[in-house]
Amino acid sequence: ALMMKPGDKSGPRDAYFLDVQKALIAAGIAMPTMVVDRTRLNANIDTLKGFLPPGMGYRIVAKSLPSLGLIDHIRKRTGTGRLMTFNLPMLLEISQAMPEASQLLGKPLPVQAARQYFEQLPLEVSGAADNVQWLVDTPERVMQYAALADEFGRELALNVELDVGLHRGGVVPGEVLGAMLAAIKAHPRLSFAGFMGYDPHIPSLPTAMGWRERAMKGVRKTYADALVQAGGVFGADAMAGITRNAAGSPTYRTYQDTEIASEVSAGSCLVKPTHFDTELLEPHVPASFIATPVIKSLPVTHMPGLEFADGATRAWNPNASKTVFIYGGNWLADPVDPPGLEYNKTFGRSSNQEMLNGGPDLEISPDEFVFLRPHQSEAVFLQFGDIAVYEDG
């Protein structure tokens, strides 16, 4: 049993986080805040650019970086005009702020949402709609978008979602894909924009016995067969200019030539939440943190109704010695500084004042900051107001 006894994880604070804390206090920030480190973000952008093979395009995944300022900065540093968007508000916002940007839908939008896009798009940025590629996954959806094109008298560029092994919908080469391509070709207001094949399942497959390698070959074969099938319908000239979109942050490094994909999508690897701590993304560094003020810092942990067990709990687990209550909480995130902080499973989570416990060497006062690393960026970033950009103190 002593083998299972937790060791004390508390200790001195990380100098990096003390510097960020100093900057937050100097800026007068006193509420839960999403912090993005510009130096680290830029390093991640440069890492991504460095891994792209010659001729490979890059598309920014807007849902993973849900801030126009952030997207604009990444566009400038990468020189890309390509974005992947995922819902109606995002599509409208980017169409107005960046009407010249190419937007590829990352999931098929219900046709009613696409209709609302055309209804709500301001006249002065009407041309932004010509830069949108609408994702379609079934023959039925192609027909819905054909009717929409007629309704608004607009030409729509359709991108076909391929199932390259994720099995989250999309189509495989064969009869159904043939019907979709034929329907697009037959309609005067529809054009074939290309394919999207998303493969985030790859890194979770074991490398043992060649499983991952086989799956990657499967991705490439499915994509290659779809390209051949589309070439038979539209001809070589039309195929030369299509979008061949692939990957995501977890797999962009596996595309080492432009034989299959002409562009890769990525977003999360630029801020690197914990779900992206994978071997392929090891060269990327965490660049986003939740910073939240300490409301109360207590020298001893007392559990409501279980006070009789407090001493025994501390003796068994030194990391339960002290308590802090933070401003807010219950985020998809893990505490990273001060070191050794843990959620209290017995007390439970709280969105108002979350309890965190630490060991005997935990030193933090009210109004100082606890730092947490988000698990993902897309949902977590949107829970905060303006992003605080940190750079060299």
Question: Can you annotate each of these PLM segments?
Answer:
Residues 300-393:
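C-terminal accessory subdomain/extension
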Residues 58-204:
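Active-site-proximal beta-alpha core segment in soluble small-molecule metabolic enzymes
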